[in-house]
């Protein structure tokens, strides 16, 4: 089994090193990851300047681009043949609820799914630097085995969030839905020595709604959350309402 591993924390991050090590026990692993941290870049793709990839160790490539770039380069060029599965992670910090829309980790798995390749995004839900990457990596390896045997439904990826706990304190794994976070938008404004303003985004408080059945609810209770995601963003519940609107009267 050929496994492409990527992330958004950068090729030297502890999470991806741990993940690659665990997956080497079950397949041929090639790491293609950003050469620096690219957290919260979402599904960005580099189109207006060339990308460079350096093989910093055997089967480990550092790319001066985004996680989505890395998946593209890995699948179409660097691996030589299509991987059987793509695993993105292990991210430092959870990717739950609405946060997945920002996540480079999840977007890398989405890119693989767009190309018809099974994919997982794996995150360690920690508020610090993370102590239990090995636990998350071991779980990811077990899940890769299951996916390789059973496959995934079309256009589906798995978003996995593992509590930052020792193995003996984990309460098992559950399938969940995407949760909901309440955002308090806040911009911090500062002034540089030349009198020009600069800004920091995202300094407000961030709270998840503790709703049963969601990813956050599970992780908060020491459970591994496995959320199936798909690429169709259509809001089907709104179709009936919108079809009652008379768009024919709109003038352009």
From Swiss-Prot:
GO molecular function: 3'-nucleotidase activity; 5'-nucleotidase activity; exopolyphosphatase activity; metal ion binding; nucleotide binding
Keywords linked to the UniProt accession: Cytoplasm, Hydrolase, Metal-binding, Nucleotide-binding
GO cellular component: cytoplasm
Residues annotated to bind a divalent metal cation: 8-9, 39, 91
Subcellular location: Cytoplasm
Catalytic activity: a ribonucleoside 5'-phosphate + H2O = a ribonucleoside + phosphate
EC number(s) on file: 3.1.3.5
Cofactor remark: Binds 1 divalent metal cation per subunit.
The keyword Hydrolase appears for this protein: yes
Enzyme class (EC, first level): hydrolase
SUPFAM superfamilies: SurE-like (SSF64167)
Cited Gene3D superfamilies: Survival protein SurE-like phosphatase/nucleotidase
One Pfam family cited in the UniProt record for this chain: SurE
InterPro entries referenced in this protein's UniProt entry, alphabetically: SurE, SurE-like_Pase/nucleotidase, SurE-like_sf
PANTHER family: 5'-NUCLEOTIDASE SURE, 5'_3'-NUCLEOTIDASE SURE
Family per record: Belongs to the SurE nucleotidase family.
Stated role: Nucleotidase that shows phosphatase activity on nucleoside 5'-monophosphates.
NCBIfam families: PRK00346.1-3, PRK00346.1-4, PRK00346.2-2, surE
Name by which UniProt lists this protein: 5'-nucleotidase SurE
Species of provenance: Geobacter metallireducens (strain ATCC 53774 / DSM 7210 / GS-15)
Species classification: Bacteria, Pseudomonadati, Thermodesulfobacteriota, Desulfuromonadia, Geobacterales
Gene: surE
């Amino acid at each position: 089994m050929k496994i492409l591993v990527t992330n958004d924390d950068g090729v030297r991050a502890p999470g991806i090193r741990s993940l690659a090590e665990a997956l080497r026990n079950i397949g041929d692993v090639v790491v293609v990851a950003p050469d620096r941290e690219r957290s919260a870049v979402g599904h960005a793709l580099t189109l207006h300047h060339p990308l460079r990839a350096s093989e910093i160790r055997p089967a480990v490539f550092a790319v001066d681009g985004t996680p989505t770039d890395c998946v593209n380069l890995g699948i179409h060029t660097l691996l030589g043949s299509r991987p059987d599965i793509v695993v993105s992670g292990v991210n430092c910090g959870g990717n739950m609820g609405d946060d997945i829309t920002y996540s480079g980790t999840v977007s890398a798995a989405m890119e693989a799914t767009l190309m018809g390749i099974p994919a997982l995004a794996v995150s360690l839900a920690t508020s610090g630097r993370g102590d239990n990457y090995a636990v998350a990596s071991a779980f990811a390896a077990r899940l890769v085995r299951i996916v390789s045997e059973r496959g995934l439904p079309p256009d589906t990826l798995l978003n996995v969030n593992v509590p930052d706990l020792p193995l003996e304190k984990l309460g098992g794994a559950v399938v969940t839905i995407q949760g909901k976070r309440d955002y308090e938008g806040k911009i911090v404004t500062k002034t540089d020595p030349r009198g020009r303003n600069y800004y920091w985004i995202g300094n407000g408080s961030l709270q998840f709604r503790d709703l049963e059945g969601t990813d956050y609810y599970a992780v908060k209770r020491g459970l591994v959350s496995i959320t199936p995601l798909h690429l169709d963003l259509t809001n089907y519940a709104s179709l009936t309402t919108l079809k009652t609107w008379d768009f024919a009267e709109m003038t352009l």
